[in-house]
Amino acid sequence: LIYISMGTVNNDMTTFYKNCIDALGSSDYQVVISVGNQVDIKLLEGYAASSNSKAEFCILPYVDQIAVLQKADVFLTHCGMNSVSEALYFKVPLVMYPQTNEQKGVAFRVDELGAGLYLTDETVMGIQTAFHEVIQNEMYQKHAGEISDSFARCGGCKKAVEKIVEVFA
């Protein structure tokens, strides 16, 4: 399963979504695209249907991201901190396409840690190449798993509360 979401704010990206459909159409993957409410879903569904693709596209305004990430093989994301943290928690490697400076910082760090690939070419070929690299190179999955394991070692909410109390005591 490939999951694509550009977040809830800056997601009016019809041309980019069409490029993703073209890039992934020859794959055997199920592709879930969460586009928000600014994009004409019927237009994208029609575009996907007319492309004679092998991939199965599911285009929705919003999805239960946690549920989708538990099944995803790769996540193309805008690199919001929550989205990236959730993906890495579930050991999902990333194709990263940040839109803001904060998101670029998150993408830079994930790239540095080897758990994702920074998408610099938003053309059909660029998107296709990025997905191929992340899917074929097991390093991304391995590093996403290592980050997930480090999250587990942090101790969760209970440990966070203990630390806060310790600092302010």
Regions found by a protein language model. Give the residues of each.
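Donor-nucleotide binding loops and adjacent catalytic segments primarily
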Residues: 1-74
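Residues at alpha-helix caps and immediate loop-helix transition turns in enzyme cores, especially N-
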Residues: 15-16, 106, 156
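Hydrophobic, well-ordered secondary-structure elements that form the walls
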Residues: 20, 31, 68, 76, ...
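A donor-sugar binding/catalytic signature common to diverse glycosyltransferases
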Residues: 61-108
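C-terminal amphipathic helix plus adjacent low-complexity
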Residues: 126-169
